[in-house]
Regions:
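A short, Lys/Arg-rich alpha-helix, primarily the initiator
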Residues: 3-40, 94-118
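Arg/Lys-rich, glycine/proline-spaced intrinsically disordered segments
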Residues: 21, 175-183
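Short basic helix-loop element that most often maps to the first helix and adjoining turn
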Residues: 32-51, 76, 107-128, 152
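Conserved hydrophobic/aromatic packing and binding residues within compact polymer-binding modules
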Residues: 34, 45-49, 59-62, 88, ...
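Recognition helix of helix-turn-helix/homeodomain-like DNA-binding domains
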Residues: 53-69, 130-145
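Short, basic-rich loop-to-helix N-cap that marks the start of a DNA-contacting helix
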Residues: 65-79, 142-155
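Short C-terminal boundary/hinge segments that cap the last helix of small helical domains
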Residues: 82-97, 158-174
Length: 190
């Protein structure tokens, strides 16, 4: 089977399944944030690839949503653009980095510490995320993973994906305000 036949069967785009009625994953807006930051920095795709050490076409594929980057790639892109990786990957924290360099150093230790604190086995975390225990072990051993996988792990552990990946922002995201706030007095309940 050649690549042309594969595209006919699978299609040229990498799609991420989204459950209807639940909030979209934060990383899905990464292509729009990357395009916005690149244009604000007045940098071409090619120049950004060279500055961040990427491969030919990588920025185009990410901006078109055809590729989900690793957290390490996002950290390099964020540094090249002068923005925070937490903002670029997940829309968390602020846009401006102001001399700050995002890094994924310590991600493995943070994942292991949170999993141990919650007394979860790799198998149980795997069931919650759909990942294999071996995949979780590889990340805990220092392996890199996509921003989508890190967000799945963070959601299952009820922590911030930006904190897990880049050690930026609070460990736990504030609860989103959906729906009507609770009644403050009996008169408000009517």
């Amino acid at each position: 089977m050649n690549i042309a036949q594969l595209f006919v069967i699978v299609g040229p785009y990498y799609t991420v399944p989204v459950t209807r009625g639940s909030p979209n994953p934060r990383f899905l807006r990464l292509p729009q944030r990357l395009t916005k930051a690149r244009k604000a920095a007045d940098v071409t795709r090619r120049a950004l690839e060279q500055k961040a050490g990427g491969t030919n076409g990588a920025i185009l594929y990410i901006e078109e949503g055809r590729r989900v980057p690793t957290v390490e790639t996002v950290a390099r892109l964020a540094h090249a653009l002068g923005v925070r990786a937490a903002w670029l990957a997940y829309g968390v924290e602020e846009l401006d980095a102001a001399g700050f360099r995002s890094t994924t150093v310590g991600m493995a230790a943070r994942l292991l510490a949170v999993r141990a604190a919650q007394q979860l086995s790799r198998a149980e975390l795997g069931r919650r995320t759909g990942l294999s225990p071996r995949a979780i072990a590889k990340i805990e051993a220092g392996g890199q993973s996509g921003v989508d996988v890190i967000e799945m792990l963070a959601k299952a552990l009820r922590i911030s994906p930006a904190w897990l990946a880049f050690n930026e922002g609070p460990q736990v995201l504030p609860a989103s305000r959906r729906g009507r706030p609770p009644a403050q007095s009996p008169a408000d309940a009517r």
